[in-house]
Amino acid sequence: MSIEAFTRLFDEVFTKGHLDAADELVAPKIIDHQFAPDGSPGRTMTRDQFKAFVRALRAGIPDLHYTVEDAAQAGDKVWLRVRARGTDNGTGQFGHPPTGKPISIDVIDVARFADGRMVEHWGVPDRMGVLQQLGHHV
């Protein structure tokens, strides 16, 4: 069940922007261990804050599309290898002004589920690769 829930989260919420689906798939509070796009460390966030994060991400990359490349589950944890594609058109999501360039980013995402909802998340995006694609010297 959790692989399906995590895959659905990427498809419906991140790719299609159906934020109401997060009500079913995300707990009222989650612990997110991934660094935020601005470099701040992981944090506890409410479901509404999670939705705001997705909204901001989609504003910066309006044609954002995720493809789940691989999935595995052990107990209450699910691992996904995903590829995100889109165009850097919006709000300077990556700490630099928008470039209008296409991006493709590989991400390893791990989530812990309880009662069918995500309660904890770890994400490892290839941010260096994205910055290089956008022409930034790092």
Where would I find each of the regions flagged by the language model?
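C-terminal and inter-domain tail/linker signature
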Residues: 1-138
